[in-house]
Design a protein with these regions (language model features):
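N-terminal amphipathic alpha-helix/helix-capping segment at the start of soluble metabolic enzymes
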Residues: 1-22
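Short, well-ordered coil/turn segments that N-cap beta-strands
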Residues: 2-5, 39-41, 66-70, 92-95, ...
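A short N-terminal beta->alpha junction/helix N-cap motif
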Residues: 16-26, 45-49
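Catalytic domains of carbohydrate-active enzymes, especially glycoside hydrolases
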Residues: 28-46, 88
Length: 151
């Protein structure tokens, strides 16, 4: 395991969820440029499938920012992964698809109505599919029991 620490910023996506915190494309690009100047390792630029505006923001930031990895968020759904891959094309080797899937017991039981084994299968398939487009795929373990992910 590496001792290297990487900084991953979600301001352009997660930060926009705060009331009154939305940014237009120019503002997002300005923030991304400042993050680049500060030496941020990874910038999560948006959720490309959610709107044309988010797609364009991710695509523009992927094209303009040269020193950081650029991430696009996607659910474990082929259409989301494809939208993220398309938006991230200008980033080339710096592209990262950040996949998520509801994994808490409550979400699995009541929202997705799926067993843990099915969630694990969906996660593995989503990561494998994303790897067809980019080399860097992130899938955070969120509230699944630790024993599920041990080898």
């Amino acid at each position: 395991m590496s001792d290297q620490i990487y900084f991953f910023d979600t301001t352009l996506r997660d930060g926009e969820q705060c009331p009154g915190a939305s940014m237009n494309l120019r503002e997002k690009l300005e923030v991304a440029r400042q993050m680049e100047r500060l030496g941020m390792d990874v910038i999560e630029a948006g959720f490309p499938c959610i709107s044309d505006g988010d797609f364009e923001a991710v695509h523009t930031i992927a094209r303009e920012i040269k020193k950081c990895r650029i991430a696009g968020l996607a659910r474990c759904v082929k259409a989301d992964i494809e939208a993220a891959a398309k938006a991230l094309e200008p980033a080339g080797e710096r592209a990262r698809i950040h996949i998520f899937l509801a994994t808490s017991k409550l979400h699995m039981q009541f929202k997705l109505k799926k067993a843990e084994s099915e969630i694990l299968r969906m996660a593995a398939e989503g990561v494998s599919y994303a790897k067809q487009f980019v080399q860097d795929v992130e899938f955070p373990r969120r509230t699944l029991p630790a024993q599920t992910w041990t080898s």
